[in-house]
């Protein structure tokens, strides 16, 4: 999604963009790319294949966003003189580029050694967000919405690969507090597991499949529960009251950093929720009953992520092109 967000900004400025990837293996991602009229070329893997493809396409610049490529690919393309930008997470994973973008919280505090001549854009000022997020960003922090049963929206990526949905619904049910929840379940097995959760009086859960209307569902909700990760920045930009679940144990540090900002609530680590939902219920219960606290969290997130990250990144890329072409 972050590459798609930057692509949208580049297209907005008049650039022609092509994705080189195996998007057909993830249908919802393929739909997102092609639905914007962006061309797709099949993925290639070796340095020689990349140089041949980039020459055939007549590229002016390349943007990398990959954990799988051999470091030799990055080095060979940069050595060819083609201006390059790489989106990275912490360690560069072998990525060599003229511009390195690390949009992770706290990354601006790190001082890694850079490739010769490279610059680094780090922190939430460079978060890359899609049009559908920016179009729905409120002009002001959301005001408290009191009265009525709170509306909850829960989603965990395109596939919910770790099966978080049923356990989050168990935690919500364990609060005993009335709510109306919309939960995304990408498969029948997950949907059945969610439907099997015993609910208390006044609690209602609707299960749907993957949707392209995530942002609209977010802004229509009083509480959004999602996996801690890059989608968190979308929630904060939209002024959502965000409850985060750490779905992978080795991501606890990033999860804790985000919660420590005061702009989101930590629902818990998924392995803990699976063992016992009571701790998560103790977090969610008060939040469901306190519109003022939900509004405070929403305002903090709205201020933390201003939605202009892709503009700043594109500015640097076009400045690079102006110097090198």
For the regions a protein language model found, what residue spans apply to each?
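Acidic donor-binding loop of glycosyltransferase active sites
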Residues: 219-230, 240
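A short, well-ordered alpha-helix in the C-terminal region of glycosyltransferases
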Residues: 293-307
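Donor-nucleotide binding loops and adjacent catalytic segments primarily
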Residues: 138-222
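Short alpha-helical segment that forms part of, or immediately flanks, the ligand-binding pocket
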Residues: 215, 232-238, 256
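A nucleotide-sugar donor-handling region in carbohydrate enzymes
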Residues: 96-163, 184, 191
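C-terminal alpha-helical cap of glycosyltransferases
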Residues: 306-325
């Amino acid at each position: 999604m972050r590459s798609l967000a930057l692509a949208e900004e580049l297209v907005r400025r008049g650039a022609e963009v092509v994705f080189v990837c195996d998007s057909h293996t993830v249908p919802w991602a393929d739909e997102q790319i092609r639905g914007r009229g962006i061309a797709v070329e099949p993925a290639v893997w070796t340095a020689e294949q990349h140089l041949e493809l980039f020459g055939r396409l007549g590229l002016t610049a390349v943007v990398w966003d990959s954990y799988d490529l051999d470091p030799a690919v990055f080095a060979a393309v940069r050595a060819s003189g083609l201006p390059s930008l790489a989106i990275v997470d912490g360690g560069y994973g072998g990525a060599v580029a003229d511009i390195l973008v690390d949009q992770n919280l706290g990354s601006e505090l790190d001082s890694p050694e850079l490739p010769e001549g490279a610059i680094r854009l780090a922190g939430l000022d460079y978060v890359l967000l899609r049009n559908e997020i920016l179009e729905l960003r409120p002009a002001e922090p959301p005001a408290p919405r009191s009265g009525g049963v709170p509306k909850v929206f829960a989603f965990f990526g395109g596939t919910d690969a770790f099966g978080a949905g049923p356990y989050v619904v168990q935690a919500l049910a364990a609060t005993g507090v009335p709510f109306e929840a919309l939960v995304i379940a990408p498969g029948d097995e997950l949907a059945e597991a969610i439907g099997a959760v015993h609910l208390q009086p006044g609690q209602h859960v609707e299960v749907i499949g993957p949707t392209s209307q995530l942002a609209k569902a977010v802004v229509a909700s009083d509480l959004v529960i999602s996996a801690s990760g890059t989608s968190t920045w979308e929630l904060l930009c939209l002024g959502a009251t965000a409850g985060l679940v750490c779905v992978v144990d080795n991501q606890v540090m990033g999860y804790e950093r985000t919660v420590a900002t005061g702009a989101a609530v930590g629902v818990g680590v998924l392995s803990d929720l699976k063992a016992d939902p009571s701790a998560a219920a103790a977090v969610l219960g008060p939040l469901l009953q306190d519109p003022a606290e939900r509004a405070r969290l929403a305002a903090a997130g709205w201020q933390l992520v201003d939605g202009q990250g892709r503009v700043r990144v594109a500015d640097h890329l076009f400045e690079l092109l102006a110097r090198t072409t």
